[in-house]
Amino acid sequence: MGVTQRGREFPGEFADVLIAAQAGEPLALRELFDWLSPAVAGFLRSRGAHDPDGSANEVFLRAFRTIQTFSGDDQRLRTWVFTITRNLLIDERRAAARRVELVFDDGRAPGREPRGDAEADALIALRDERVAELLAHLSPDQREVIALRVIADLSVDQVAAITGRGYEAVKALHRRGIAALRRAIEREGVPR
């Protein structure tokens, strides 16, 4: 029986894939990457990472460098990977505070070139902008918990382990964050 992630079955038996990944098998590493990378990139995007896809790749580089030290099941692996993700985001924010960023005349930062499909790029930018606007109504703690619970699809226990908060504190932040989002949407309406 495979492990499911939002309706997507984990390919193979987790224990077998983990053993192969720990031995450095490229296909096993790819299976783990394919299983978790959309949620990692989504979390990074929701938290305002400068280059979510590049940062997600860095998360997996860090994780795969030390995967042989990991022990646990699939949910423990998700928690471990999202702990790495959160730490990377903190590191990037600290580094960003110490550097000056170059910006092109058209407002793009280096590394943020269009992908070639202007319509798709525009829709992605609008969606990301709308999500960022809604998340701006939340406290930083609520934003983090909502991103981990909803976008990364982690359990309350996993979010508590990643953030170092108690179970009840995570539940309260999640509940208050959802209520604040609901109020913001009701106030502003849903764009058509």
Where are each of the predicted segments found?
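Helix-turn-helix DNA-binding module
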Residues: 133-136, 140-144, 152-169
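Internal acidic/polar
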Residues: 7-14, 91, 99-124, 128
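C-terminal edge and immediately downstream basic/flexible tail or linker adjoining helix-turn-helix-like DNA-binding
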Residues: 2-4, 8, 161-162, 178-192
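Short, charged helix-capping/linker segments at alpha-helix termini
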Residues: 3-7, 22-30, 41-58, 167, ...
